[in-house]
């Protein structure tokens, strides 16, 4: 039985999390909180969720021993949790399946979502198509340009994609616009947030749906190797793939946990050069919860940078903020250059194209493997596949199609 039982009933991970939202949104948030409390332990809901994960998403995903990479590094043994093999190509669908099933039970007919890299938008459009729900996706204009393939995928699936032209025109602004929509259309609309941010119950609910990653990993590692892994590594933007892997291991003190943020051009080059609030940010409130943020001395959000569209969110899930402060997890940062190098290494050595987000975790896993002995075992969460990033990488490397 796990001794870790956060958040509390108000959504707090000690000083982080909570519900910081406008009065106009409290009705919708309260309705969602009550519905999730009602259905999360309901046998029929759990059965349908698990069946969909198995037969529609394709779970369980493999835990793959990257023997070629391990041999090349001559260090620790590296295992990859292959979330890239899910339907739609990333971990995002674990969460959208759960929230869409909840929306149906709440009688909602319209789904809205925000997206950065486009993977959450695609995963939301996918489940909306399957369940016959109207779907609107808000996506920053900058992200629309750098993720054109995913925009087309969403439209093919029947979603309406609305480019957001306010602010930095990226993920933060997409969330703002989605929340405005939700306030205006509370009666028929369900907002599927794509990561472990937002007002309670979102950080808990998204974690719960993503925790299948760690639960599977624990069983798979015990079967393949025995015992527990030495180290877990996952990339952190909002942090849903990471908390999905970490959650099952939080009570296992022998397992070291590393979350990898985006150092962009380098942490030393200042706050606009990276997206690493846990490594170089401060505590504040954004999108309904208290957490670490990229903000200036006046409390204004700083627009950071990452090569990866899924890692340039200026905040992070409140549970990660708690895990950092408590010392249970360590948070580090990897530069664009290091992530790109790791992308090429994994592609050439194992024949697996990781997403640029996941490449940050791969890069740090490679660093650790070189430092640790051959008897150590590292699990890296390969949160998504890299098909969506081919154009970005080609552009950076001066390749034209």
Swiss-Prot record:
Origin: domain of life: Bacteria
Q: Which CDD domains match?
A: Trp-synth_B
- What residues bear N6-(pyridoxal phosphate)lysine in this entry? 92
Which Pfam families does the UniProt record give?
PALP (PF00291)
Q: What metabolic or biological pathway is this protein involved in? A: Amino-acid biosynthesis; L-tryptophan biosynthesis; L-tryptophan from chorismate: step 5/5
Q: What does this protein do?
A: The beta subunit is responsible for the synthesis of L-tryptophan from indole and L-serine.
What interactions and quaternary structure are annotated? Tetramer of two alpha and two beta chains.
The broad enzyme category this protein falls into is: lyase
Q: Which reaction does it catalyse?
A: (1S,2R)-1-C-(indol-3-yl)glycerol 3-phosphate + L-serine = D-glyceraldehyde 3-phosphate + L-tryptophan + H2O
- Species of origin reads Ruthia magnifica subsp. Calyptogena magnifica
Name of the gene encoding the protein in the UniProt record: trpB
Q: Mind listing the UniProt keywords for this protein, alphabetically?
A: Amino-acid biosynthesis, Aromatic amino acid biosynthesis, Lyase, Pyridoxal phosphate, Tryptophan biosynthesis
Family named by the database record? Belongs to the TrpB family.
Q: Which SUPFAM superfamilies match?
A: Tryptophan synthase beta subunit-like PLP-dependent enzymes
| Name of the protein in its database record | Tryptophan synthase beta chain
Task: Give the molecular function GO annotations.
Answer: tryptophan synthase activity
One GO cellular component this record assigns the protein to is:
cytoplasm
InterPro entries in the record: Trp_synth_b_CS (IPR006653), Trp_synth_beta (IPR006654), Trp_synth_beta/beta-like (IPR023026), TrpB-like_PALP (IPR001926), TrpB-like_PALP_sf (IPR036052)
Cofactor(s) recorded for this entry are: pyridoxal 5'-phosphate
UniProt EC number? 4.2.1.20
